[in-house]
UniProtKB/Swiss-Prot annotation:
This is Nitric oxide reductase FlRd-NAD(+) reductase. The gene is norW. One of at least two accessory proteins for anaerobic nitric oxide (NO) reductase. Reduces the rubredoxin moiety of NO reductase. Pfam families: Pyr_redox_2, Rbx_binding. It comes from Shigella boydii serotype 18 (strain CDC 3083-94 / BS512). The lineage of its organism: Bacteria, Pseudomonadati, Pseudomonadota, Gammaproteobacteria, Enterobacterales. InterPro entries: FAD-bd_OxRdtase (IPR050260), FAD/NAD-bd_sf (IPR036188), FAD/NAD-binding_dom (IPR023753), NO_rdtase_NorW (IPR023961), Rbx-bd (IPR041364). It is an enzyme of class 1 (oxidoreductase). GO terms for cellular component: cytoplasm. Its EC number is 1.18.1.-.
């Protein structure tokens, strides 16, 4: 017997898809399979749990049972999918299997842990489940090392510092947020973190970790070392593509999908952090929301392509929040930066003086939507 639409995953992407399908069809069979509890929580909240004194269970917004009842679902929590037989259209776990008409892969991405000696001592904060496993250690830690100065690393560094902890942030780039914007734009946030007491080790490399009687010894390059109580990996995300690979799907940085969110197999789709849409991986909430709306229509028989507008990315650093949009990582832009006490507006323009990107901070963030309208589509 077919289970209709089968979705592997239970995070934000999967839930958005369920809600959009149910807006259009109240009865089509929907089956969700996931390795976690399937309870709903807001993942961006993980960047602020320490300063707000929240436990993992405090993040739960809706239990799996409530979710199933509200949306008429068949749920299989704590279930690892072991194989996909794409030819027979069957999903398999160790103790069960499910026939599907259409299959959606929405399992997200896992935190990348740098392959250094002692890497097993590093913690990750990419899910409620991961936070639950280490919340006591993080709450009790006085000295914290964060590996990675990107978006998540910068958010966590500020949060742990606001909680009164001694924070060191290490990155091999010369500035924080290096993959998102040039140093002259990120310097305002970098200066604020330093003012707060975050010890920035830029152009530096973690070489290994070792447990000691009094904590964890982190060995760095240039014969340096520091001792801390906890180490957090914030060096990016990697989709777990082994399952899709065994199903014969085309893989690059994620599972490759077209504008219809369809993989190289006509009956299998991918969504969220797991998907690479026409060559782009977009691990942000707005593109996932828009993708879920389009995919719901297509699973129900439409043929609607995904058209993504230029979108804002929000960096949730409360002492100095930032919004950015456009091609902020382009190397050939000329940046016009206006700074004042209330905030910053940085405009990135090309050789023709066309606005291609912007970054705004603090009180100047209210200008973001006006600037967004002037960016080319």
């Amino acid at each position: 017997m077919s289970n209709g639409i089968v979705i592997i995953g239970s995070g934000f992407a999967a839930r958005q898809l369920v809600k959009n399908i149910r807006k259009q069809d109240a009865t089509i069979p929907l089956t969700l399979i996931a390795a976690d509890s399937m309870d709903e929580y807001n993942k961006p909240d993980l960047s602020h749990v320490i300063s707000q004194g929240q436990r993992a269970d405090d993040l739960t917004r809706q239990t799996a049972g409530e979710f199933a009842e509200q949306f008429n679902l068949h749920l299989f929590p704590q279930t690892w999918v072991t194989d996909i037989d794409a030819e027979a259209r069957v999903v398999k776990s160790q103790n069960n299997q499910w026939q599907y008409d259409k299959l959606v892969l929405a399992t997200g991405a896992s935190a990348f842990v740098p392959p250094v000696p002692g890497r097993e001592l590093m913690l990750t904060l990419n899910s409620q489940q991961e936070y639950r496993a280490c919340e006591t250690q993080l709450r009790d830690a006085r000295r914290v090392l964060i590996v990675g100065g990107g978006l998540i690393g910068s958010e966590l560094a500020m949060d742990f510092c606001r909680a009164g902890k001694a924070v060191t942030l290490i990155d091999n780039a010369a500035s924080i947020l290096a993959s998102l914007m040039p140093p002259e734009v990120s310097s305002r946030l970098q200066h604020r973190l330093t003012e707060m007491g975050v010890h920035l080790l830029l152009k530096s490399q973690l070489q290994g970790l070792e447990k000691t009687d009094s904590g964890i010894l982190a060995t760095l390059d240039h014969q340096r070392s520091i001792e801390v109580d906890a180490v957090i990996a914030a060096t990016g995300l990697r989709p777990e593509t082994a399952l899709a690979r065994r199903a014969g799907l085309t893989i690059n940085r994620g599972v490759c999908v077209d504008s219809y969110l369809q993989t190289s197999n006509d009956d299998i789709y991918a969504l969220g952090d797991y998907a690479e849409i026409n060559g782009q991986v977009l691990p942000f909430l707005q593109p996932i929301q828009l993708s879920a709306m389009v995919l719901a229509k297509n699973l129900l028989g439409n043929n609607t392509p995904l058209k993504l507008p230029t979108m804002l990315v929000k960096i949730k650093t409360p002492e100095l929040p930032l919004h950015l949009a456009g091609e902020t990582q382009r190397q050939d832009l000329r940046w016009q930066i206006n700074t004042e006490r209330q905030g910053m507006v940085a405009r990135g323009v090309d050789d023709a003086d066309q606005l291609r990107a912007f970054v705004v901070s603090e009180d100047r963030m209210k200008e973001a939507f006006g600037l967004l309208k002037t960016l080319p589509m």
